[in-house]
Design a protein with these regions (language model features):
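Short, charged/polar connector segments at secondary-structure boundaries
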Residues: 1-119, 125-126, 171-183
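Conserved small/polar residues in nucleotide/adenosyl-binding loops
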Residues: 187-192
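Charged, low-complexity surface segments at secondary-structure and domain boundaries
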Residues: 72-77, 159-166, 186
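Glycine- and acidic-residue-rich phosphate-binding/metal-coordinating active-site segment common to enzymes
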Residues: 108-111, 115-178
């Protein structure tokens, strides 16, 4: 069993936990249920199976598991706990055959919050994986005049048209320019003979 890996991951978690406390920051995973309310949401869209960047997986959907992880998704519970044993077993499975089962997440403002699969995310982040398969439910915020909200809705349109979900702009019109560029490439590339 990968108890050694758990202990290493736990040390990374403890380091992040202590660093957050020293800066007066919340030391655990952000909880989507605590960040938004139903009145903040215009609707939900089931996006189905997607590959998502682990860098964009930032928290958990509900408070239930949040104190098992530091804010970097590394475990902080005792290695000899049931949680530690399950994490270690999942680590063994990942080493032997990989993690194939998709996690389930909410996407909100192009960040992902785990509904099911926190330990899978933790193990994959520990091993430095780039992405994870996920069943994604998008929570659409109500439209506002805030620049971040406008950029997000540009992203939603871009994602709907291209399927690309791993590019994030911080200024308005970035997605329009990229869409024009992609369209230009599609229409100017030489046709096969």
């Amino acid at each position: 069993m990968s108890l050694n890996d758990y202990v290493k991951a736990q040390k990374l978690g403890e380091k992040r936990y202590q660093a957050a406390l020293s800066k007066n920051e919340y030391p655990y995973l952000p909880v989507l249920d605590e960040l938004i309310t139903n009145s903040d949401i215009a609707g939900e869209v089931n996006l189905g199976l997607q590959h998502i960047s682990l860098d964009r997986v930032v928290g958990t959907a509900t408070k239930g598991r949040t104190t098992a992880f530091a804010s970097n998704f590394m475990p902080i519970l005792d290695a000899n706990s049931e949680f530690g044993n399950k994490w270690s077993s999942l680590c063994d499975s990942h080493i032997e055959e990989g993690i194939h089962d998709p996690i389930k997440v909410y996407e909100y403002m192009n960040k992902f919050y785990v509904i099911e699969g926190n330990k899978r995310v933790s193990v994959l982040k520990y091993f430095g994986a780039d992405s994870v398969p996920a069943m994604v439910i998008r929570k659409l915020p109500k439209r506002t005049d805030e620049p971040e909200n406008k950029i997000y809705y540009e992203f939603v349109d871009f994602h709907k048209q291209t399927g690309i979900n791993y590019i994030w702009f911080t200024q308005l019109a970035g997605y329009d320019k990229l869409r024009e560029y992609i369209g230009c490439l599609l229409y100017t590339s030489p046709s096969p003979r």
